[in-house]
């Protein structure tokens, strides 16, 4: 009855699909040709008609798929019965090889069977992929149907509102009708796809199973053919060797060259046997890889099929996790690459032996006589046998190389399948509970599991595994070497302590402190801390090699997993010694370091064994003890981590450094509080059943902190190097200044006293020089680089479980319309896209802040650039980063440039009118940065302002005048107004001085005085040369003009001061008085009578009115 109802529904849907009217494609094609040939061109009409044709083509494809789905529904009983009958009729035994087949026939049969096997394997894989695609589509079909119906309703609404009879309206009508027909066919197709999904999936599974069985039979038959071929080749080689050896036994005194051929043939025969064995092993590895790939694919399909039921059952999650845990490990392709390279080398050797055979026929006896007939017959038999062996080895080598290539491909497929399973595990199982929530009976479960663990013959397995580890060559040698390394470390510990004391004594002394001391301390500290972790790793390796004892292997996995943590903790303890790296070299306070290492013994004695036990329970008996003993270990680990983290916070270790390099900021406190609260949240998550999720997140969080601490150590190492360099430079300058002072003092004393003075022996003060003020810009650059490295490292670390956050892609926030090749479609903007956009904006902000400084300090300052060019490059780089980051970030949330450009254009026009002055200044700033009419450091005069350019921004330029006042000038003024740049291409400027001289002075003498003063002035340049001219005679005074040149604007005022002093000194030396402007004074008597005397400025009287 159910089958009849399904058939009727499918028939109704298919009838609706076929009955849906659609425009005639021929008519649309004719209209399109006419539109293309029309004058003038009609691009909108052409685009609409072309869109209609594309929609009709898609409709045709949907109709074909509807027929296929309908056939599957109608013929499913018959098709499934046929496939099951074929499966039941297949023989379990493979085909037998005919014993009378020759070598050539076997080779030909092997080629044919290999081709058939490849086809069947490909067919099985295709059917598996088809079944997986059908399973994946089941979750997407409802949403696709909803979207298609919504689009269809929108098309129908637009069809109802379309009016007009123009060619464009008709073309748009054709496009809408075609889209409507396409969407109707698509809705029917999706309905039938959903109805026939189970049938199609079952048929694909049956076809895949049938192809897999056929491929297994072909593989067994192919292996039998290869075994038969190898056996024939070995038999022929052995017969040939026996016959030639029989001839050799009957002949005596054979030459050495013939005896050597016997040895070579035996070696070639042994190589042929080894090649046959290796080919059998490769074939078995191929079968194993194929079966493992099938197992992984089945686990992947099971995981995807059962993913929708994970939220309703914890047992299902546990079962799926156990199934994933039983999957094989990732293959190692490096071994195959090495073997393939060795095969190619062997092939060259065999070809060389073949090429040497003509030369071997020309050998002679030891006395130079030619070979006898018997010896020639033996030699020919040997060479014939050798040639057959070499040909067999070459053919077998090529076959083995081909099989190794197939094995490599199979391993690659297995690796891809394992990656897909890993991604699917993170996607579907990461946020599902893997153990039952804790109840009141949980302590009883712990006691029962502990009793059960002891009853598993634990100590006996460990004892037998230890005996196996001590008796195996593969494990005893590394263990013995690790013990020797530990002994050497204990013996050399006192030398290391003395080295630390000597190094610490030199730290801070200018002439003895070197950066090499810090590097040596870093290297030896890491080396001294390594022996115990190496021994721990060796023990783990030995236990993992004890494969007959699962408990020992699980413990070995736990021991190996704790090696990095143990090594890091021991390195930190070595760094924290009183004379170690942290205190003596970095200058960290001893109390802070002691507080940070307060729980060192707890880390070694509690956290490391607990992590080892946790990993052991995760790898033992399908995680049988994870819910009880494993969860207990994890809770204890979280508690210990919270205590250790609190201790590190109190020690003042920074997780975030601000611009000043200080960790005392709110971001640092927030990060530490998050780190303290993370283990407590993990305890709560494990209590409610999310043990594996809590483990993965907490492990990556703590690893992120470890990465940051490593970069913090690197930062302080670089900081110490900068401190040493700065301190040494300052000390060299101090010595130079002291030497100059002593030299000046010595020049004022007598020679005898100079030799007898105790100051002649200069003692260099080697006390510590307090120069801790390192370049803030360099340190800021280092912090920026390390922050970017930390960000990238954390992104790579967390990207391993990025698929676990795939649920964010299912949380749709809003929809946007995107147009691709003229077809509009709705795309949802998810929460994951928004978070990625926020991350892009954060990275862009960091790059904008730090990358220009990185360019300036790392690259630009080492280039020979004109003033201001570096600033222009960094500014343009900053704007480009902002533009690219903005476009990428906005595109993540659906705001594409194709939509944004119109808004930008409209805003540009509107703001251009409303804020035209600001936009003019902005554009002028860009012009200034590119054309560079002014640069930072130039001296300019604009309007009535003169000063030096100190800053060029995109809106305004800052000028500092001679009064040290900062003047903000809009950039538009430098583009639209006239201004003077005193130092654009040539910083040399002319200074013109007007010098008066008395009328009775010799003009040539005055000219020489002025030129001499100019030549003696230290700020006057020689080229162009100074010039003096007698330019005027005013009221009995000679007016001279001195024209001199200064190298830069800053020299103009000091030059005037110095040249005036030199001119006054020159006039005084030559007895020339500086004249002053003439004036006349008329004297009147006290009683009002006029005396008739007039005094000139020179004090000489003359009659009024006289000349």
UniProtKB/Swiss-Prot annotation:
Annotated GO MF terms: mechanosensitive monoatomic ion channel activity
Transmembrane as UniProt keyword: yes
Signal peptide: 1-19
Transmembrane stretches, start-end: 467-487, 522-542, 551-571, 600-620, 628-648, 674-694, 698-718, 785-805, 828-848, 875-895, 910-930
Membrane topology designation: Multi-pass membrane protein
Residues forming coiled coils: none
Disulfide bonds: none
Subcellular location: Cell inner membrane
One GO CC term, this protein: plasma membrane
Pfam families, sorted: MS_channel_1st, MS_channel_2nd, MS_channel_3rd, MscS_porin, MscS_TM
UniProt keyword list: Cell inner membrane, Cell membrane, Ion channel, Ion transport, Membrane, Signal, Transmembrane, Transmembrane helix, Transport
PROSITE patterns: UPF0003 (PS01246)
Gene3D superfamilies, sorted: 1.10.287.1260, 2.30.30.60, 3.30.70.100
InterPro entries: LSM_dom_sf, MS_channel_1st, MS_channel_C, MscS-like_channel, MscS_beta-dom_sf, MscS_channel_2nd, MscS_channel_C_sf, MscS_channel_CS
Predominant location category: membrane
Single Gene Ontology BP annotation: cellular response to osmotic stress
Assembly with partners or alone: Homoheptamer.
Function text: Mechanosensitive channel that protects cells against hypoosmotic stress when highly overexpressed. Gates spontaneously in response to increased membrane tension.
Family: Belongs to the MscS (TC 1.A.23) family.
Listed NCBIfam families: PRK10929.1 (NF008180)
Protein name: Miniconductance mechanosensitive channel MscM
Taxon lineage: Bacteria, Pseudomonadati, Pseudomonadota, Gammaproteobacteria, Enterobacterales
């Amino acid at each position: 009855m159910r089958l009849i109802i399904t058939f009727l529904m499918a028939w109704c849907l298919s009838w609706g699909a076929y009955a849906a009217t659609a425009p005639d494609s021929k008519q649309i094609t004719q209209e399109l040709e006419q539109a293309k040939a029309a004058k003038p061109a009609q691009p909108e009409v052409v685009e609409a008609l072309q869109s209609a044709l594309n929609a009709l083509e898609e409709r045709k494809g949907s109709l074909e798929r509807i027929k296929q789905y309908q056939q599957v529904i109608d013929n499913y009983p018959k098709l499934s019965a046929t496939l099951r009958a074929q499966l039941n009729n297949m023989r379990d035994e493979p085909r037998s090889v005919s014993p009378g087949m020759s070598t050539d026939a076997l080779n030909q049969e092997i080629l044919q069977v290999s081709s058939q096997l490849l086809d069947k394997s490909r067919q099985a894989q295709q059917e598996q992929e088809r079944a997986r695609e059908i399973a994946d589509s089941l979750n997407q079909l409802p949403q696709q149907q909803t979207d298609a119906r919504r689009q269809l309703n929108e098309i129908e609404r637009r069809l109802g509102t379309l009016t007009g009879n123009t060619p464009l309206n008709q073309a748009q009508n054709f496009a809408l009708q075609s889209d409507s027909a396409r969407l109707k066919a698509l809705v029917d197709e999706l309905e039938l796809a959903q109805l026939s999904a189970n049938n199609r999936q079952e048929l694909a599974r049956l076809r895949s199973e049938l192809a897999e069985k056929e491929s297994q039979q072909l593989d067994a038959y192919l292996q039998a053919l290869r075994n038969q071929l190898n056996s024939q080749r070995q038999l022929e080689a052995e017969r040939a060797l026996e016959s030639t050896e029989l001839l050799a036994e009957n002949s005596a005194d054979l030459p050495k060259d013939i005896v050597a051929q016997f040895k070579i043939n035996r070696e070639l025969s042994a190589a042929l046997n080894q090649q046959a064995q290796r080919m059998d092993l490769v074939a078995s590895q191929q079968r194993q890889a194929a079966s493992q790939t099938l197992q992984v694919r089945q686990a992947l399909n099971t995981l995807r099929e059962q993913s929708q039921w994970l939220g309703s059952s914890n047992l299902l999650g546990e079962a799926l996790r156990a199934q994933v845990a039983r999957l094989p490990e990732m293959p190692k392709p490096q071994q195959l690459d090495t073997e393939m390279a060795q095969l190619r080398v062997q092939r060259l050797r065999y070809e060389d032996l073949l090429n040497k055979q003509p030369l071997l026929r020309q050998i002679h006896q030891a006395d130079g006589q030619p070979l006898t007939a018997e010896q020639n017959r033996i030699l020919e038999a040997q060479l014939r046998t050798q040639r057959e062996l070499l040909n067999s080895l070459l053919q077998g080598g090529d076959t083995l190389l081909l099989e190794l290539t197939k094995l490599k491909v199979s391993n690659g497929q297995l690796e891809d399948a394992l990656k897909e399973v890993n991604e699917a595990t993170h996607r579907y199982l990461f946020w599902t509970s893997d153990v039952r929530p804790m109840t009141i009976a949980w302590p009883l479960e712990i006691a029962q599991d502990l009793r059960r663990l002891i009853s598993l013959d634990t100590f006996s397995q460990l004892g037998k595994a230890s005996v196996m580890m001590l008796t195996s060559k593969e494990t005893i040698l590394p263990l013995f070497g690790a013990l020797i390394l530990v002994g050497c470390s204990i013996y050399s510990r006192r030398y290391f302590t003395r080295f630390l004391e000597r190094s610490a004594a030199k730290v801070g002394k200018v002439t003895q402190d070197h950066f090499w001391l810090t590097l040596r301390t870093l290297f030896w500290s890491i080396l001294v801390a390594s022996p115990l972790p190496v021994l721990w790793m060796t023990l783990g390796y030995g236990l993992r090699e004890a494969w007959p004892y699962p408990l020992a292997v699980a413990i070995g996995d736990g021991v190996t997993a704790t090696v990095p943590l143990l090594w890091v903790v021991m390195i930190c303890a070595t760094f924290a010694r009183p004379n170690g790296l942290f205190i003596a070299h970095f200058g960290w306070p001893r109390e802070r370091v002691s507080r940070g290492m307060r729980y060192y013994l707890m880390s070694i004695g509690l956290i490391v064994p607990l992590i080892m036990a946790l990993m052991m329970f995760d790898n033992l008996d399908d995680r049988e003890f994870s819910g009880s003993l494993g969860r207990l270990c994890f809770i204890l680990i979280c508690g210990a981590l919270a205590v250790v983290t609190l201790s590190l916070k109190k020690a003042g270790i920074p997780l975030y450094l601000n611009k000043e390099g200080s960790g005392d900021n709110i971001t640092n406190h927030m990060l530490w509080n998050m780190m303290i609260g993370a283990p407590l949240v993990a305890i709560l998550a494990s209590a409610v059943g999310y043990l594996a999720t809590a483990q993965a997140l907490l492990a990556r969080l703590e690893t992120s902190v470890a990465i940051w601490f490593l970069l913090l150590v690197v930062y302080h190492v670089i900081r110490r190097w900068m401190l040493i360099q700065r301190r040494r430079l300052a000390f060299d300058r101090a010595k130079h200044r002291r030497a100059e002072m002593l030299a000046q003092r010595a020049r004022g004393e007598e020679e005898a006293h100079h030799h007898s003075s105790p100051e002649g022996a200069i003692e260099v003060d080697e006390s510590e020089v307090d120069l801790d003020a390192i370049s803030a810009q360099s340190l800021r650059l280092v912090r920026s680089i390390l922050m970017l490295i930390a960000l990238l490292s954390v992104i790579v670390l967390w990207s391993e479980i990025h698929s676990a956050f795939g649920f964010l892609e299912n949380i749709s926030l809003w929809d946007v319309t995107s147009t691709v090749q003229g077809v509009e479609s709705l795309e949802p903007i998810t929460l994951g896209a928004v978070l990625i956009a926020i991350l892009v904006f954060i990275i862009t902000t960091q790059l904008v802040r730090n990358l220009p400084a990185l360019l300036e300090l790392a690259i630009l300052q080492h280039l020979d650039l004109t003033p201001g060019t570096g600033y222009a490059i960094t500014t343009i780089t900053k704007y480009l980063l902002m533009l690219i980051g903005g476009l990428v970030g906005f595109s993540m949330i659906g705001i594409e440039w194709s939509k944004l450009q119109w808004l930008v254009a409209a805003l540009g026009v509107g703001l251009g009118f409303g804020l035209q002055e600001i936009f003019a200044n902005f554009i002028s700033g860009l012009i200034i940065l590119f054309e560079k009419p002014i640069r930072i450091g130039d001296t300019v005069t604009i309007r009535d302002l003169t000063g030096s350019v100190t800053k060029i921004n995109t809106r305004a330029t800052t000028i500092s005048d001679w009064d040290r006042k900062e003047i903000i000038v809009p950039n538009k003024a430098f583009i639209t107004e006239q201004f003077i740049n005193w130092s654009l291409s040539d910083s040399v400027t002319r200074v013109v001085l007007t010098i008066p001289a008395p009328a009775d002075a010799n003009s040539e003498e005055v000219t020489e005085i002025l030129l001499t003063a100019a030549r003696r002035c230290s700020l006057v340049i020689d080229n162009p040369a100074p010039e003096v001219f007698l330019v005027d005679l005013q009221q009995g005074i000679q007016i001279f003009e001195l024209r001199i040149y200064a190298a830069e604007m800053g020299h103009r005022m000091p030059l005037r001061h110095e040249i005036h002093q030199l001119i006054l000194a020159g006039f005084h030396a030559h007895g020339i008085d500086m004249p002053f402007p003439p004036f006349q004074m008329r004297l009147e008597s006290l009683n009002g009578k006029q005396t008739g005397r007039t005094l000139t400025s020179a004090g000489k009287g003359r009659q009024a009115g006289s000349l």
